[in-house]
A protein has these predicted regions:
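Small/polar loops that bind or transfer phosphate-bearing groups
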Residues: 10, 38, 64, 97, ...
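ATP-dependent carboxylate activation and anion-phosphoryl transfer catalytic cores
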Residues: 1-3, 13-16, 27, 31, ...
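Short beta-strand segments at enzyme active-site cores
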Residues: 8, 83, 194
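A conserved helix-loop-beta module that forms one wall/lid of the active-site cleft
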Residues: 32-93
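A short, GP-enriched loop/loop-strand-helix hinge that lies immediately N-terminal to
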Residues: 1-41, 56-61
Length: 320
């Protein structure tokens, strides 16, 4: 028999890429439509949406050759982020600091993804923030705001993530919630959306990426907020409304504890692996530390990841 429809938003980027093939086979796509998924993935369409929503993004351009890439990079000023469009796990994404880097990176990218445009963006120094939200076409539910501890540009699967975000001003949080609402409405999201932001200074908020699907942070944010995001999104996809399901739309109140997600790596098992972190994902697992304070949650997360930290107290008389 023919399926009533397919849900592509729970299978990561791989499932999103099957959307077109499924539609050609006559399978209806449930949840966010294929056309709106495209708007989030296609650079030019997405730029139009950001403009409509009045949301800033790092300046950049779309190129096809190394020459064009160098032109854009020199116009923006180094460092820049270079990446192929439509990628999974940040594959082929690099931070370039000069023209030589660009020649090298474009050579590598063209080996893995021909005929795809390449994005060159200004690399912003700032805090990387991530949000997963559920939208029913009218209302948006944001379980919480997560903050990555490392510099921006480390792949989100490899970064240490903290909920609730520790260093954001109320104004920045309000902007993040408002931008999430605008984007979800503008992309006509039915189900899940994942958005990554960079916050520079006190409260300059830029959008760096939107995924109209479930992301790897969904299990983490569900666990630490107690909101069952996947069952909720599944019900929304088949037509239920957030309010009917007993939830208050908007950014939910922050928990009174701290949860730290820690990536787990297998470098000791993989000989010759490059252990420096960047925009390409290298972790093979993750674990979670929950406590009343950030320090203790971080300590528990390190223990969970198998990293033994030295225990000592610093006394005043120890200092020279």
């Amino acid at each position: 028999g023919k399926p009533d429809g397919a849900v592509v938003q729970f299978g990561g980027q791989t499932a999103i890429k099957l959307t077109e093939a499924l539609m050609k086979m006559g399978v209806p796509i449930l949840g966010t439509s294929a056309e709106n998924v495209d708007k989030a993935e296609d650079r030019e369409l997405f730029d139009e949406i950001l403009e409509e929503c009045e949301i800033p993004r790092p300046t950049g351009g779309t190129v096809f050759t190394a020459e064009e890439a160098k032109e854009v990079a020199n116009r923006l000023g180094y460092p820049v982020l270079v990446r192929p469009s439509y990628v999974l796990g940040g594959q082929g994404m690099q931070i370039a600091i000069n023209d030589n880097d660009i020649d090298e990176f474009i050579g590598i990218i063209n080996r893995i993804a021909q005929d795809h445009p390449i994005l060159v963006d200004k690399y912003l120094q700032g805090k990387e923030i991530e949000v997963d939200a559920v939208c029913d076409g009218e209302d948006i539910l944001i379980p919480g705001i997560m903050e990555h501890i490392e510099r921006a540009g480390i792949h989100s699967g490899d970064s240490i993530s903290v909920y609730p975000a520790q260093s954001l001003t109320q104004k920045a949080k309000d902007k993040i919630a408002e931008y999430t609402r605008r984007l979800a409405k503008s992309l006509h999201v039915i189900g899940l959306i994942n958005i990554q932001f960079i916050v520079c200074g006190e409260d300059d908020v830029y959008v760096i990426e939107v995924n109209p699907r479930s992301s790897r942070t969904v299990p983490y944010i569900s666990k630490v907020t107690g909101i069952p995001i996947v069952p909720l999104a599944s019900k929304v996809i088949i037509g239920n409304k957030i309010k009917e399901l007993g939830y208050t739309p908007g950014l939910q109140p922050e928990a009174d504890y701290v949860a730290v997600k820690m990536p787990v790596f297998s470098f000791e098992k993989i000989r010759g692996a490059d252990i420096s972190l960047g925009p390409e994902m290298k972790s093979t697992g993750e674990c979670l530390g929950i406590a009343k304070t950030f320090d203790e949650a971080l300590y528990k997360a390190f223990l969970g990841a198998g990293i033994k930290l030295p225990k000592f107290k610093k006394h005043d008389h120890d200092c020279p």
